[in-house]
C-alpha cells in the first residue's frame, strides 16, 4: 500500500521561525511534529513509537521571508500490518519574491502500531469555489485547563489562513497586497481538543472594488464535524485585475478534506448593535500593552492579542458579578462563548497601552450578551469593539445553566439599554 498527495500542514512562517532567512531546526521539528499528528488523524490510528527517522533530502539555502506560506506534503508506505513509513516534505510556497515552490526538507519516519486494524484513510477531494487556507493541529499552548482550544487561537489560526490567501493573491503583482480585516464574526459549533487536526476552508460571499467578504469553516478531521463558522469582511488595496485574480484562485481545483460543501450565511445578530462609544457606567475590565510577541505580519497587535485581552476582560467582568474563581471552583462552573462579533477600527502598534471597558447588553435566563471596547490609553481612540453571546456552564454535567439571581442583580447595574 502506497498513498501520496496528502497535505498535512499549511501555515505561515513568522519572524521567530527563521534565522538569517533560513528555517530554524526547532521550527522544522515543530512543523514535522504537527504533520505527524495530522497524519494520525488521516489514517485514524495513533502510532506507538517512531522506530527510525532519516533525512532523505535537505536544502539549507532556501531563502525565506517572514510571513511566507509553507506546506507539508505526505506520503504513506505500508511496510506490514503494524509498521508504516511516513515521508514528510516541507515546501516553501511560490510567492511574489519566490518564483517556484522549493523543497526545504524531506524526512522519513518509520512508525510502529500495536493495533492490527487496517488503515482507514480519510479521503480528500478536488473541489472548486473554495480555498483550503490552513491545516494544522490544536497545540498544548492553544488549550485551556480542559484541553479545549481557547477562543483567541481560533482567531489566530483564522488570521494565518487569511494571510495564506493573500500571499497567493499577491503573486502576480510582485509585491505584498495590503489588506485589513474590518469585521470578523465567529459562531462556535463543536469543541475541539488537544491534538485535533483542523482545516480552514474559505468561500467567497462577495468581492467588489476593494472589499472581500469570506465565509469560513473550521473542519475537525478527528470528529468529522465543523467546530466553528466565520464571516469576515476584508478591505484591500486596489490593483488592476485583482478581483479577477481572486476569482481565478477560487475557481481552480483545490484539495480538501471537507466532506460537505455547504456555506450558509451566519444567522443575523439579534437586537441593535450598541454604539461605538463607551457607556458611562462601563466597567474597566482589563489593562494590557502590545509587546513584540503580540505583533503580526503588519507589525501591529494581532487579532490573537486582541481576543486574548477579551478573554481576560471577561474573567474580570464575570468576577465583579460574583462568578469569581472561588465560586467557579466550588461549584465546578465554567463559561462558554457561542458568538463573537468584532469590529476593528484602528491598529494597535508596539508599545501601545490599551484598556477594556465592558457592559452587558442583554441578560437572559441562560444566555448573556455583553460588549467590550478596547481603548488606546494615550488618545482615547476606540481600537475595536466586540459583542459576545455566552453561557455559564456546568462542567460536570456538560450543560449550560440558569444564570443565578445574585449574578443577575449585579450584572443589571452594568446593563446598557439596547
Give short role names for the model-derived ranges.
Residues 1-39, 121-168, 263-323:
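Catalytic strand-loop segment that frames the active site of acyl-thioester-processing enzymes
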Residues 2-10, 54, 59-71, 75-134, ...:
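HotDog/MaoC-like acyl-thioester-processing domains
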Residues 28-31, 44-47, 62-64, 156, ...:
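Short secondary-structure boundary/capping segments within folded domains
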Residues 43-51, 172-179, 327-335:
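Short, basic/aromatic beta-hairpin or loop at an interaction surface
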Residues 109-111, 320-325:
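Glycine-rich, pocket-lining loop/helix-strand segments that form or immediately flank
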